[in-house]
Amino acid sequence: MKYFTLFMISYIFISIFVFSHIHDVEARNRICRTSEKYYREFCGHAGNDDCLSKSTKKPKPFKCVCHDNRSQNITSINDRYNNCICTFYC
């Protein structure tokens, strides 16, 4: 009985570890696409295994394509933004 109890406890812990690891890998492999107005400093960084940035608490971009667009209300010659389409881990 003692060995059976030890076996069951070990089996439960191993099952929880394997299930959580598989779920984590599946979550990382899911990719969502969003199109928003991001600045090149944000879009230029490649994502890593962490889903959320520790500083911004936003998803880290995996791949981004940015285009320079002039603002409608140009106040200076440098008044423009980068319109980026970013693919995120989510």
Swiss-Prot record:
Residues 1-27 form the signal peptide. Disulfide bonds join 32-90, 43-66, 51-84, 64-86. It is found in: Secreted. It comes from the Eukaryota. One of its GO terms (biological process) is killing of cells of another organism. Pfam families: SCRL (PF06876). Keywords: Antimicrobial, Disulfide bond, Fungicide, Plant defense, Secreted, Signal. InterPro entries: SCRL (IPR010682). Belongs to the DEFL family. This is Putative defensin-like protein 168.
